[in-house]
Amino acid sequence: LHCNAVRTSHYPQSQYFLDECDRLGLLVFTELPGWQHIGDGAWKDRACAMLREMLLQNRNHPSIILWGVRINESVDDDEFYTRTNQIAHALDPSRATSGVRYLEKSHLLEDVYAYNDFSHNGSNAGAKRKKDVTPDLSKALLISECNGHMYPTKSCDDAPHRQEHALRHARGLDAAYADGEHAGCFGWCMFDYATHKDFGSGDRICYHGVLDSFRNPKLA
């Protein structure tokens, strides 16, 4: 795929995966586990404990460049995320922190604003401008997801559909790298994956990958 970085989205991976990233020189953005939900005080305590475990287990992996200290796609919670950010910086002051958002101009307590940019519809700009997304222009903006569910594509779809899928990924990358405002861009996502009945294409599969579930490449 000619990628130079991977986001673990949004759960820590096996040590063997990180070992291979170290060997290959593949840069890693790894994250606190979770998706959208923030629980009560006991839940937050457990999340902080898991964050500590993740850092202590993995901070000696040279491939890791960014710690995700927010629950993926969650709302702002300044008290909780001040706490997680402080934990990460205390245990590893050498690396930057971030947290993946679907929100524009949410409270930025970390070092890098990570944003899921699903704005491209095939006929508009490939990505949003930095000034429209982050509240602090002095800090880096990273596209943590793009395309994905906006244009699900099966390996068996017709050629025009598969071609448009590839072009949408290309437009997102072009927009992110052309303006000099983005620190990088992660597409969503590498593989098609199983899901629950209320999500995806009705057959319990999300066809969001640039490869299918069996690791066969699509045009993208």
Residue ranges and their predicted role:
Residues 5-219:
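Substrate-binding/catalytic cleft of secreted carbohydrate-active enzymes
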